[in-house]
A protein has these predicted regions:
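Juxtamembrane inter-helical linkers in multi-pass membrane proteins
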Residues: 84-103, 176-178
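Alpha-helical transmembrane segments and their helix-start/interface "positive-inside/aromatic belt" motifs
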Residues: 5-21, 61-63, 106-115
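Active-site and channel-lining beta-strand-loop segments
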Residues: 29-61
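Alpha-helical transmembrane segments
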Residues: 18-20, 55-77, 147-156
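Membrane-water interface of transmembrane alpha-helices
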Residues: 32, 72-93, 163-169
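Hydrophobic alpha-helical transmembrane segments of integral membrane proteins
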Residues: 94-126, 156-164
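Alpha-helical transmembrane segments and their immediate juxtamembrane interface regions
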Residues: 57-61, 105, 129, 135-178
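Hydrophobic alpha-helical membrane-insertion segments
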Residues: 16-27, 67-75, 112-122
């Protein structure tokens, strides 16, 4: 059986947005490196007071490497949704496979790729938000709230995506189990 899963337009758009956000932020860091303060806030106490500062190279470079590794891994995984979507539907794949079950398996793999791409986009933007909050944490309370709300928003979107995936997968499996 051919494990190739076609790419939908929305998946291509998600991948393009993720690439733009990822490489756009790297370009932003390179261009604005001299304008970034030498010391960045790296830790706050429970009262919201700055406890520790770090040099920008020791803060941004390792975090950028972590983001790059996560980005590459998640993007590679998105090219192989069959490896991730190892559901019970695969046990139906025999020599006498009919198109009904084949289409269910393809829909599961398409859905899996979409959720992986959404996760990739959310993680890249979450890291970028954290970077920006570290760079521009000049004691502006509004900025800290925006960062907090952004992180909460990304978390809610990620949880909603996972729930959507779960319920959609159950619907597909229920409609194709005989």
């Amino acid at each position: 059986m051919d494990d190739k899963v076609r790419w939908t337009v929305s998946q291509k758009i998600l991948l393009a947005l993720t690439l733009i956000c990822f490489f756009g932020f790297i370009i932003y860091l390179v261009v604005c490196w001299n304008q970034i303060p030498e010391r960045l806030v790296s830790k706050y106490n429970a009262g919201g007071e700055v406890v520790r500062y770090s040099k920008k190279a020791f803060t941004l470079v390792p975090m950028m490497m972590i983001e790059s590794i996560l980005f590459v891994i998640i993007t590679i995984i998105s090219f192989f949704p069959a490896a991730v979507a190892n559901t019970n539907a695969t046990k139906y794949i025999q020599d006498d496979l009919n198109s009904y079950k084949k289409s269910a398996l393809e829909r599961i793999r398409l859905l899996t790729r979409t959720i992986i791409l959404i996760s990739d986009l959310l993680f890249v933007n979450l890291f970028n938000t954290i970077f920006l909050s570290m760079i521009y944490s000049g004691g502006v309370l509004v900025q800290h709230r925006v960062t907090l709300y952004s992180i909460i928003g990304f978390t809610v979107l990620f949880a909603a995506s996972i729930l959507f995936y779960y319920f959609r997968l159950r619907q597909i499996m229920k409609g194709h189990s005989r």
